[in-house]
């Protein structure tokens, strides 16, 4: 019988761990539970004493000295959290290395360069006459007067600033051509409102097609195309062939690039600012009569166009003269070399400085 009996291992009392101590080691520190129906106040007290291993021990000291205050585990330590954040995201150090520009400024003792502020230009002030017409017969009479004035001029070319206005709606798009403004003399601008005009007067068509008249403006070709769509008595192609786009002409004379708006061209050539108020620009140009702001806006557009034309004409003459004088003194090879370096010859150059 003994061989069929298995010997059961006898547990040593020395290896036994008290139940309460084992539970205390495994359990994490916890907040005392709320009393339930099954727990008695005495049992709750025993459980708190058994599981609360994080309670700080009282330090030995003089009798009567209060024990250290217990930390609230539920409230995070703000100081520790700040230190942890600084360790994760250390503050960026400013590089002490000097670049080429900062080194030169440090040696010279000059302050660091500031961002250039845009130059404040004075606004255009037009003090000339504004002749405003709304009826077809009045427009015809005015255009005929200008036509006679053009024919009396001795010059072969009579520059005339030309511009148009029309209403625009984001729902319906651009409306019909409503205003034509012209300027042949900086002292007078003509504004023709076409709301009541079903067909352009013959005198106005003859004026803009006159062989001596050179119409000019910014993006003027698109104006002629729109005018021809709205009024079939106008043919766009002959007007486009003889007109002058001031932006393209500026690129040729000043050797600049890109597309120009009238506002930017005014800043660059005339050193003036334009008040391109959206309230006026997007206003109801077909409504009669135009108010003072609309009349001034329309007049300034062609007035400044005439000013820009005269200035570009003057610069072109200076440029041609300087180029010819330079070629005579230094030869074609030197002239080509200077052009390669980006010289515009808008100012006089006597000798080659390569």
Curated annotation (Swiss-Prot):
One biological process term in Gene Ontology: nucleobase-containing compound metabolic process
The 3'-5' exonuclease domain, residue ranges: 149-314
Disordered: annotated segments: 1-120
Biased segments, Basic and acidic residues type: 13-30, 37-50, 71-91
Cellular compartment(s): Nucleus
Enzyme class: hydrolase
Gene3D superfamilies reported for this sequence: Ribonuclease H-like superfamily/Ribonuclease H
Protein name: 3'-5' exonuclease
Organism placement in taxonomy: Eukaryota, Metazoa, Ecdysozoa, Arthropoda, Hexapoda
Gene name in the database record: WRNexo
């Amino acid at each position: 019988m003994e061989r069929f009996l298995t010997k059961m291992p006898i547990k040593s009392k020395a290896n036994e761990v008290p139940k309460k101590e084992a539970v205390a080691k495994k359990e994490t520190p916890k907040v005392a539970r709320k009393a339930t129906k099954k727990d008695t106040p005495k049992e709750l007290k025993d459980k708190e004493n058994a599981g609360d291993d994080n309670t700080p021990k009282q330090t030995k000291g003089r009798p009567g000295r209060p024990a250290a205050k217990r930390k609230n585990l539920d409230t995070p330590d703000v100081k520790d959290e700040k230190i942890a954040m600084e360790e994760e995201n250390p503050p960026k150090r400013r590089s002490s290395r000097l670049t080429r520009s900062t080194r030169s400024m440090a040696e010279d003792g000059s302050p660091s360069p500031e961002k250039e502020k845009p130059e404040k230009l004075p606004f255009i002030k037009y003090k000339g006459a504004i002749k405003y017409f709304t009826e077809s017969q009045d427009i015809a009479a005015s255009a005929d007067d200008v036509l006679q004035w053009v024919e009396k001029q001795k010059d072969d070319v009579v520059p005339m600033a030309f511009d148009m206005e029309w209403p625009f709606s984001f729902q319906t798009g651009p409306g019909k051509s409503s205003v034509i403004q012209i300027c042949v003399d900086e002292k007078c601008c003509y504004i023709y409102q076409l709301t009541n005009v079903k067909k352009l007067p013959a005198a106005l068509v003859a004026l803009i097609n006159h062989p001596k008249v050179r119409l000019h403006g910014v993006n003027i070709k698109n104006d002629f195309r729109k005018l021809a769509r709205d009024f079939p008595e106008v043919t766009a192609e002959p007007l486009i062939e003889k007109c002058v786009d001031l932006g393209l002409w500026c690129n040729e004379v000043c050797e600049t690039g890109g597309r120009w708006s009238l506002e930017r061209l005014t800043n660059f050539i005339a050193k003036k600012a334009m008040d391109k108020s959206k309230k006026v620009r997007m206003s109801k140009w077909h409504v009669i009569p135009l108010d003072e702001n609309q009349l001034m806006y329309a007049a300034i557009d062609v007035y400044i166009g005439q000013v820009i034309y005269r200035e570009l004409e003057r610069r072109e003459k200076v440029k041609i003269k300087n180029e010819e004088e330079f070629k005579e003194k230094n030869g074609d090879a030197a002239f080509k070399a200077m052009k390669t370096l980006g010289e515009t010859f808008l100012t006089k150059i006597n000798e080659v400085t390569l």
